[in-house]
Amino acid sequence: MFKTQTTLLTSLRRFSSSSQLKNSKSLYEQTIPNLMINSDTKVIFQGFTGKQGTFHAQHAMDYGTKVVGGTNPKKAGTTHLGKPVFGTIEEAMKETKADASAVFVPPPLAAGAIEEAIAAEVPLIVAITEGIPQHDMLRVSDILKTQSKSRLVGPNCPGIIRPGQCKIGIMPSHIHKPGCIGIVSRSGTLTYEAVNQTTQTDLGQSLVIGIGGDPFPGTNFIDALKLFLDDPNTQGIILIGEIGGSAEEDAAEFIRAANASRSTPKPVVSFIAGATAPKGRRMGHAGAIVAGGKGTAAAKFEALEAAGVRISRSPATLGSLIVEELNKLKH
């Protein structure tokens, strides 16, 4: 049974890759700037009145995020947390001109909610939901690649935050500090570890993107790296990967090429979770599985190191290593 699931997952990944090649990659790449949220970003919550949606919408508002409303077809026309409730995301967009949506919709309906947001041309869609069927996300992935209006972060992710300005997700806001380090991660809890360390070292964060641990993320490492490399406020980058797939190896190749073309390369520090995971066993996330001898932590470490990335063998040293790398630039 497990072998069948592993084979299916591998096949889906291959199908997705070939499908993406057929579509126009340049279209979806145009949405990368949509990730740069700020204090003016207006946010709609899909699944607004549910327990999780309510809790995290309130926390976002407390942080200063401009939450302008939410959706619930059964409660359209009412208010919740002092904000309007709309029947559809299309109606919400017409009334609020929102810049982003946060998806707190149960797994069976979440892909549909994402597709509705794409149809409504929401610039940034942040899908927090875990457990969305992979066939559904494969369909969403193909839809994303055919358009240039909406950018997806997630699913199964902690979200995205620009410290001191805007929070869309479930991350603990108090550990963040405005600063100069861009953080991108497949792991939620390890994201918080990197955030806390860069706060403690007084570097702070320019933008933190939790891309999620599912096999078909709306935003990958390379998307985030492109944003960070072009962002003048980002001086260093922390990349946290996991076993499984080839996202980290792809990122390594991109970093190698990008830094070769820059007069002053931006330092990158990386940690890969799951180094002790046995072959063929899924570790936590749906995408964290070593299959067919590929996707091992060792292979990822090797690829990243060859690209000039500073490797952290423990998550506890991410903060100190990025400080060391930044100090090297001063000498």
UniProtKB/Swiss-Prot annotation:
Annotated localization: Mitochondrion
Cellular-component GO terms for this entry: mitochondrion; succinate-CoA ligase complex (ADP-forming)
Catalytic activity, reaction form: succinate + ATP + CoA = succinyl-CoA + ADP + phosphate
Entry keywords, A to Z: Ligase, Mitochondrion, Nucleotide-binding, Transit peptide, Tricarboxylic acid cycle
Keyword Hydrolase: no
Main location group: mitochondrion
Family assignment from sequence similarity: Belongs to the succinate/malate CoA ligase alpha subunit family.
Name of the protein this chain belongs to: Succinate--CoA ligase [ADP-forming] subunit alpha, mitochondrial
Active site: H285
GO biological process, any: succinyl-CoA metabolic process
Coiled coil: none
Role summary: Succinyl-CoA synthetase functions in the citric acid cycle (TCA), coupling the hydrolysis of succinyl-CoA to the synthesis of ATP and thus represents the only step of substrate-level phosphorylation in the TCA. The alpha subunit of the enzyme binds the substrates coenzyme A and phosphate, while succinate binding and nucleotide specificity is provided by the beta subunit.
Presence of the UniProt keyword Ligase in the record: yes
Source organism per UniProt: Schizosaccharomyces pombe (strain 972 / ATCC 24843) (Fission yeast)
